[in-house]
Amino acid sequence: MGKELYDGFSEARDLFEQANDYFKRRISDVMFYGTEVELMRTENTQPAVFLYEVIVASIQKTFRPDVVAGHSLGEFAALVLNGTISFEDGLNLVLKRATIAQKVCEKFNTGMGAVIGLSDAYVEKRIKEIGDETGELIYFANYNGPGQVVITGSKKGIRLACKAFQRHYA
């Protein structure tokens, strides 16, 4: 994730290296060579996505929007890109957010999953059914938009729900 940007753009390379220095570890190596398991750990996912978003927008030399916006984690990239906060402040905030989320997931054995391509009503109905059938906790976390929701709950509940939704091509 992002290796072609690192190799192809000096500005991207500089931002990757700034992030590596700030995090005191090579997040770029996790992004370029990490396993799926490593990339799925929120302590890696959130900084990686933030960094990728900032880099992709930063190398767009001819595209300078008047307004930027972001949703959830994307808000931090938007704040950096519109100059509200510095890149380093964005790294700091995202690292704190990711660390807290990782600790909560580990302490409470919880997780989350994005469900894309199914109606909100169907997802809502199925997570209730799966929860009732298994006793596992499964909840809606976000309605991101039509046909895209985030569910949260016990890791087992999320796995069961994701399997059920994959059978319906989500």
Predicted regions and their residues:
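Glutamate identity and glutamate-enriched acidic tracts
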Residues: 4, 11, 17, 36-38, ...
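Gly/Ser/Thr-rich helix-start
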Residues: 3, 35, 71, 75, ...
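Short, glycine/charge-rich beta-strand/loop segments that flank catalytic centers
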Residues: 36-37, 69-76, 98, 110-114
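An amphipathic alpha-helix/helix-turn recognition signal
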Residues: 14, 48, 72-73, 85, ...
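Gly/Ala-rich beta-loop-alpha elbow adjacent to hydrolase catalytic centers
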Residues: 53, 66-74, 78, 86
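Alpha/beta catalytic cores of group-transfer enzymes, especially the acyltransferase/condensing modules
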Residues: 22-25, 82-170
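Helix-rich "cap/lid" substructures immediately adjacent to catalytic or cofactor-binding pockets
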Residues: 1-69, 151
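Alpha-helix C-terminal capping segments
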Residues: 58-61, 79-85
